[in-house]
Amino acid sequence: MDNCIFCKIVKGDIPSKKVYEDDLVMAFHDVAPAAPVHVLVIPKEHVLESARAVAAEHAALIGHIYTVIAKLADELGLEGGYRVVTNAGPDAGQTVMHLHFHLLGGKLGPMA
């Protein structure tokens, strides 16, 4: 999608502090972190707009994303635990309509 900020990051049009990339997903540090470690993990293709749109055909992609999240948590020193958050729709706080997962670790603030 031309106006999607995450699609622009994947294409390299917008810089990011990338921590992981493969054929399916990309992970990078959030520009406004809500925790000491705050990484976004996104599918590289804009095929899903939110968690509400996830269908059975996307099960392998979602499984891959969670595998990447676990790998990143280990690499980023989150042995003490971490949170994985996805917001589904504007009322839940989703501001970028491209499926993404927040990996949050370290001392966390409020859940809001």
Residue map of PLM features:
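HIT superfamily nucleotide-processing domains
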Residues: M1-A112
